[in-house]
Amino acid sequence: KYLMAGKAVIHGVSAHSGNNYLAGRNAILEAAYKVIGIQALNDLEKGTHMNPAIVRGGTVMNAIPDSCELDFSGRFPTLAEVERVKEGLAKLFGESTIEGTHSEYTLSAARGGLEVTEEGKRLRRFVDSVSQENGWPAVGEVVLGGGSDAGYIAEMGVPILCSCGVRGEWNHTDREYALVESM
């Protein structure tokens, strides 16, 4: 899948949360609406996954926060889905739910797409046959979450298989493990 990352800064108006509550415009609250909007861009049936991942904002408990930062990423099966989400993000960050707030955002270029090609299917069939000739099961086809470095090679038009390494689970979490016997 293609991978794209984004960063946003939401600007509000600081004020004392007791004495001047109505003068403030809460940037964190506006960011919460943005998080919900980012999540709404998911299309799980197509395989598009949006992840609002990091939120930073506020300075003290008795002040309405005037700034909030939001980091997010997305994984996409096709460039058409990348474009759909880009349009949705432009609309989302171009509007405000809380009057007096505004947002700016940047996106990285979508990278690393690994779309299924005839050449890739041919390579997988070859690997399956070699595997079976040596008494191992066929590798088969599994669709994973995306953002693989294999996508860089695929972008050059070279057929490639992804995730043919050591077996394990829970990548990039504190539960991640690898099975030594699969090495």
Residue spans for each PLM region:
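Metal-dependent amide/peptide-bond hydrolase catalytic core
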Residues: L3-M183
